[in-house]
Amino acid sequence: MGLLQELAGHPLAQQFQELPLGQQVGIGFAVFLVLSVVLNVLNQLLFRNPNEPPMVFHWFPFVGSTITYGMDPPTFFRENRAKHGDVFTFILLGKKTTVAVGPAGNDFILNGKLKDVCAEEIYTVLTTPVFGKDVVYDCPNAKLMEQKKFMKIALTTEAFRSYVPIISSEVRDYFKRSPDFKGKSGIADIPKKMAEITIFTASHALQGSAIRSKFDESLAALYHDLDMGFTPINFMLHWAPLPWNRKRDHAQRTVAKIYMDTIKERRAKGNNESEHDMMKHLMNSTYKNGIRVPDHEVAHMMIALLMAGQHSSSSTSSWIMLRLAQYPHIMEELYQEQVKNLGADLPPLTYEDLAKLPLNQAIVKETLRLHAPIHSIMRAVKSPMPVPGTKYVIPTSHTLLAAPGVSATDSAFFPNPDEWDPHRWEADSPNFPRMASKGEDEEKIDYGYGLVSKGSASPYLPFGAGRHRCIGEHFANAQLQTIVAEVVREFKFRNVDGGHTLIDTDYASLFSRPLEPANIHWERRQ
């Protein structure tokens, strides 16, 4: 008590007590902030745990490296990899987040055992309000694997043969009716157009003409509102009555009702639709326990089916168009490839035609390499995980983060990695990737939805790896290649200013996309 009385009697203390309450609060907060920064810095410098990965230095507790990471995740990963190596930890909104990059890091996280890592725990707060209840991350992993299997076995070669003409027709019809593509030339904000094209093509091909007939530009806007539910702040505030969450919830109810009404119509008719689309397949599916897939789960899986690919295909197709506007000569090469390999009359595209267009395939491959739609893939740690080849053990208090885009832009595997070069995928190119041989990368594993490649030896994983690898990989490739081929037949692109610059990337969402507006100049071929 004596010490406290002496401090209270100190002239500075008396001056502080005489200040207005507002100033006292301000000074108190400033002192608290300074002390927390000092203690945080001392903790990093003096009490580092040698059995855990190095910590990215940060001044403020809780905030940590959240801002620098959020501004430009790929640059953040590259800079800290150069400082700390392939495994390091940073503070993301108060949570210790351990990054493991490179092929070994990708394998460590993405092929982690179910007892060690968990995706559901991380993502359910984001996905459940968007997709709906009882599907994807709102159900046990075993059930999710069954749901993936239902959808995967419907994606047959025969189905793809029917998809390509549907996608081609949708692309042509879109450009005929769009007011932004009237006349012989003009300027268009291409990401908005590609978002609509990808939702129309996917809904028609995967979900049938009956569903497609209910889609228009307004429904595409509803899917955009659903997509905005994936904003990073929703990891913490998914429940809050924020404007984008209100739009998300309205969109989810509206879209789910469209699917539920269609399911009821089909049930009433005996589900005897002539089309073998995904909805018909799911309505006829049964879980291993003998329970038929409930209608609300069919509706929610239909939302997930489109949403899971929409942000990726929309972003990737936008980047492709922007790259073609940046390099018009590549667009002309694509056109001449079709003339040479398919015939000067450019007959209607077929699924088999896509295999005859290697540059068209490489355009998609190279764009996915440089513009990966998902820059961060997270997993909760369920049991302590030793990092192979190191002394580090990742505790359960950490979150794991994989960044496959880091290895996809690593000069050790891709010469001149920052150069967009679709010709690099040709065997005689000086920029040809230095990757594992096909035999080394063909290890297969069945997580419950069919054999998939582990991808553990590959630095190029545009569709992920492990049990959560994208089941729509082949559809996405067919969709993107068909869209590109049809656009090239119809248009010539260039940058509005005639230069060769490229717009920056928007990292505000969980999914990387071009900053908008991203305008290109288009001209119809004669």
Swiss-Prot record:
First-tier enzyme category under EC = oxidoreductase
- Which BP terms does GO give this entry? sterol biosynthetic process
Instruction: Report the gene knockout effect.
Output: Decreases the amounts of 4,4-dimethylergosta-8,14,24(28)-trienol, the product of the Fusarium sterol 14-alpha demethylases; and leads to the accumulation of eburicol and 2 additional 14-methylated sterols, 4,4,14-trimethylergosta-trienol and 4,4,14-trimethylergosta-dienol. Leads to reduced ability to produce conidia. Affects ergosterol production in the presence of ebuconazole or triadimefon. Host-induced gene silencing of the 3 genes encoding sterol C14-alpha-demethylase leads to strong resistance of host to Fusarium species.
| Superkingdom of origin organism | Eukaryota
Membrane-crossing segments per the record: 27-47
Pfam families the record matches: p450 (PF00067)
Topology in the lipid bilayer is annotated as:
Single-pass membrane protein
| PROSITE patterns attached to this UniProt entry | CYTOCHROME_P450 (PS00086)
Gene3D superfamilies of this UniProt entry? Cytochrome P450 (1.10.630.10)
- Which pathway does it serve? Steroid metabolism; ergosterol biosynthesis
Task: Tell me where it mainly resides.
Answer: endoplasmic reticulum
Q: Where in the cell is it found?
A: Endoplasmic reticulum membrane
Q: Which InterPro entries match?
A: CYP450_sterol_14alpha_dmase, Cyt_P450, Cyt_P450_CS, Cyt_P450_E_grp-IV, Cyt_P450_sf
The residues listed in the UniProt record as binding heme, with positions renumbered to this chain, are 470
Enzyme Commission number(s): 1.14.14.154
Q: What's one GO-annotated cellular component? A: endoplasmic reticulum membrane
Residues where lanosterol binds? 123
- Relate the protein's function as given in its record: Together with cyp51A and cyp51C, encodes the sterol 14alpha-demethylase that plays a critical role in the third module of ergosterol biosynthesis pathway, being ergosterol the major sterol component in fungal membranes that participates in a variety of functions. Essential for ascospore production. The third module or late pathway involves the ergosterol synthesis itself through consecutive reactions that mainly occur in the endoplasmic reticulum (ER) membrane. In filamentous fungi, during the initial step of this module, lanosterol (lanosta-8,24-dien-3beta-ol) can be metabolized to eburicol.
Record's miscellaneous remark? In Fusarium, the biosynthesis pathway of the sterol precursors leading to the prevalent sterol ergosterol differs from yeast. The ringsystem of lanosterol in S.cerevisiae is firstly demethylised in three enzymatic steps leading to the intermediate zymosterol and secondly a methyl group is added to zymosterol by the sterol 24-C-methyltransferase to form fecosterol. In Fusarium, lanosterol is firstly transmethylated by the sterol 24-C-methyltransferase leading to the intermediate eburicol and secondly demethylated in three steps to form fecosterol.
The name this protein goes by in its record: Sterol 14-alpha demethylase CYP51A
Query: Origin organism of this chain?
Result: Gibberella zeae (strain ATCC MYA-4620 / CBS 123657 / FGSC 9075 / NRRL 31084 / PH-1)
